[in-house]
Swiss-Prot record:
Keywords: Ribonucleoprotein, Ribosomal protein, RNA-binding, rRNA-binding. Part of the 30S ribosomal subunit. Interacts with proteins S7 and S18. Binds to IF-3. Pfam families: Ribosomal_S11. PROSITE patterns: RIBOSOMAL_S11. Belongs to the universal ribosomal protein uS11 family. This is Small ribosomal subunit protein uS11. SUPFAM superfamilies: Translational machinery components. It comes from Magnetococcus marinus (strain ATCC BAA-1437 / JCM 17883 / MC-1). GO terms for cellular component: ribonucleoprotein complex; ribosome.
């Protein structure tokens, strides 16, 4: 196994001065993923309910989505981001709480867009669950 050399220099993440970007909130029934990108789509920061330490059914809660959004938002603010455009995708319970969390930590939200994919009668859906 390779060992880290003593006194080896590690590359520090450089601060990108980006004023505005896009927050993609993907909320499923099981988890909530928040990715903050610049206007070209290059990823700046991300967070998810699972990455925050929530496991199992706790990942699908609005509180977990709020914590994930705060984490991703603070990382993006470290790069100088202040203005956000928000794109929501999916049917999950963490959509609104993630959006509120981003607004609460000081982002200027210009507009909110729902980009949930809706089929024009495409693939056959999975069969109904019988519990």
């Amino acid at each position: 196994m390779a060992k880290a050399q003593k006194g080896a220099r590690t590359k520090k993440k450089e601060r990108k001065n980006i004023a505005s970007g896009i927050a993609h909130i993907h909320s499923t029934f099981n988890n909530t993923l928040i990715t903050i990108t610049d206007t070209h789509g290059n990823s700046i920061s991300w967070g998810s309910a699972g990455a925050q330490g929530f496991k199992g059914s706790r990942k699908s809660t609005p509180f977990a989505a709020q914590m994930a959004a705060e984490n991703a938002g603070k990382k993006a603010m470290d790069h100088g981001m202040r203005n956000l455009e928000v794109r929501l995708k999916g049917p999950g319970s963490g959509r609104e709480s993630a959006l509120r969390a981003l607004a609460a930590i000081g982002f200027n939200i210009s507009h909110v867009q729902d980009v949930t994919p809706i089929p024009h009668n495409g693939c056959r859906p999975p069969k109904r669950r019988r519990v």
